[in-house]
Structure formats: structure tokens, C-alpha cells
Amino acid sequence: VSTPQTQSIPPHVPAHLVLDFDLFEVTPELRDPFDKWQALLDNGAPPIFWTPRNGGHWTFLKYDDIREAYRNHETFSNRHQSIPRTEPWPLLQPNGVDPPEHSKFRNLLVPLFTPAAVSLMQEEVRRRTRMLIDAFADRGACDFVADFSGKLPTGMFIHLMGMDEGRLSEFIALADFFMRVEDPVAKARNVGEIYGVLGEFFRHKEHHLGNDIASLLLRARDTAGSGVTQQEVIDCTFLLFVAGLDTVTSTMNFIWRHLATVPATRREIAGHLEQPDKLSRALEELFRVYAVSIIYRRVKKDTVYKGVQLKADDMVVLPDNLANRDPAVFDRPAELDLTRKVNPHLTFGLGVHRCLGSHLAKLEVATALQEWLPRIADFRIDTAIPVKIYAGPVMGFRSLPLRWDARA
């Protein structure tokens, strides 16, 4: 990974709004990637500031401003939003384009991820969850990332796409590099590698259509009047590929780290496993507190927002974790309250680009809790093994060593 690009301060950026902040940086003393964001607030950072790091970008810190950027796609565009700027950059469908263009693919995908559609995936998610836990439950130890969280949502995603599960580790490595790399040249090369894999996949899938997302996209392409092109099919799959192989894994890692260190929370959740309403409320709170994604937008046109001059093509960073801990919106924002009744968190976004996979993500985490806690009720972090963390567009852990007393 190369040193992040540092850009000179543009003329429209006032000096008092400039802060030297690198969203990718992990210093030796950092133990939790959330802490680097909280430190911005603790140190009195302006609610809207500009950093010269990673090609230069704005960062919004307040809930209302982040919500506005989600809602207002006329000003804050999803199109060509990469940090650092990477060329060439794919026109990702549907999240990489704005209305009305994005509707074509979103309307194709929405029916696949409704609550009713996702409920039909329950049996498969549970089967996979049990199979993974069976492999290590009697060992008394596991690397939660390598043995469980890195395999459950990613394996399920590849199953839904109709991809070869024998190549799971290869796919994970490609998506992981995409999310972590700062060097735009290396990222462009990685994008090319992913497109190569997807091109090969679709050449095979053309002759082996099935009941999966990839086949649905190909059938849409071949439907007269759909307007769906081969390139758009691959662009859409690229987005699903990089989005589907990381965020739920990272969210699970933070949740299980919390459960490993706070027995009272373990017991409280264990008491809710067969109570859907209470479990659902607990899940919303877990997703609020552990929002792992840092979202990007690109300013579409020159505008003055809350007294700040934003220029067309400026990049904007939206840290969901700070929106979800804004005391102007949430009572006791730093506290994990599994009974919280009012919870308008932004973990899954808002507006036309709200996360398509939110119901599947909740199902996977709920099922993991339901299967894990009855079998491995008391577990802890193995402090003898160092834990490596990462920051960037998705925050998380490269490993999470856990131990428990195995049953005799």
C-alpha cells in the first residue's frame, strides 16, 4: 500500500475547516477503528471539515448532515465516488448511479430482498450456520473471522449469485483488497482483476442458467425492451460482489467482540432468542452501535451547504458510526441499549440508495446468535493472540481469536 495521496488545499476551502485526517490510517496505538472517529468529536473537529489526505475530501460528522447527503441525490451523487480517486472507475449498478437511471437495476433486485423473499432463505442460512459451528464448537477455540464471520455471509452471497463456492477464498481476497487498498494504481489493477473474474463467470453462466441472481440478470438482459446491457449486468454484479463480501462480516466481528467482553449483554440477548420482537429491537441497536461502513458521495454541482462552499466534483465522506452516536438524535448514544425504542439509525443508509441487503444482513446475524449462544454460551477473547484492525470504507478486524470451555 502506498502513502496516501495528499492534495494541496483548493481555493474554495477556508483554512479553519482544514484538518489532517486519514480515514485509512491505523496507528500502532489504535485498538478500535471507531476510536479514531470519536477522537474527531473529542478534539473539537468542525462538523464539516476538509482533509488533504487521499486526494482531498470533505467529511460530515453530524446526523442531520449525513442524512441530508443520503436524501439529496440532486446535490450529493453516487456516481463515480471513489476515495482516493481511481481511474478507470466502473459505473456501478444500481448504487453507482442516480435516479432515474438507477431504477432499472434496483427494480430488478428489490423483489429478491424483501422481508418475504429473505424469509425463504432462513433454512439455508441456518444450515450453513450450524455447519460452521459444528467444525469448531468442540475445540474450545476459533478465529471468529476465519472460521465463521468470514464464511457465513460470503458463502451465502456466493450461493445466491450462483457462483462457485470452491473459489470462496479467492473471491474474499479480491474483495478484501478492494476495500483496504489506498494506492489508486493498485486499486485500478484490482478492479480489473475482479472484472476478469466476473467476465469469466458470466461466460460460463450463459450456458448454465439457474435459479440465482446472476441468471436473473442475464434473463433481464435478453428480455426485449429491458434496456439492460451485458456491461451493466457485470457492473451490477461487481457492486454486489464487493458489497456482499465484507460489511456483514465486519459487523458480526464487532458484535461478537462485544459479546466476548460483556457477559451481561450475552445473557440479555440469549434471553431474547425466541422472542422475535425483542430480538429484532436488539438487532437494530447492535447495528446502530456497530455501523462499520464509511460512505462516499460526490458533489454534483456547486452549492453552499450550511455556509460551506462545496464545488462540483468534491468528494464527501459520511461516517455512519458518528451519525448513529449523535447526542442530538439519540439518548445515551454511546450506550448499547437492547431495549431502545426509537432508533432511526443510518447503518443501512436512507432514501433511494438504501441498502438492498439489510433484511438478509439482519437474518444472518439473528440466525448466528440463535445458533451460537445455546452452544457456546460463555466465550472470551484470547488475549495471547494479537488482533489486527483495519480502517477505510469498512472498518473491522483481520482476526478475532475466541476461547471457551469445550464440553467434555
Label each residue range with its predicted role.
Residues V1-A408:
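Cytochrome P450
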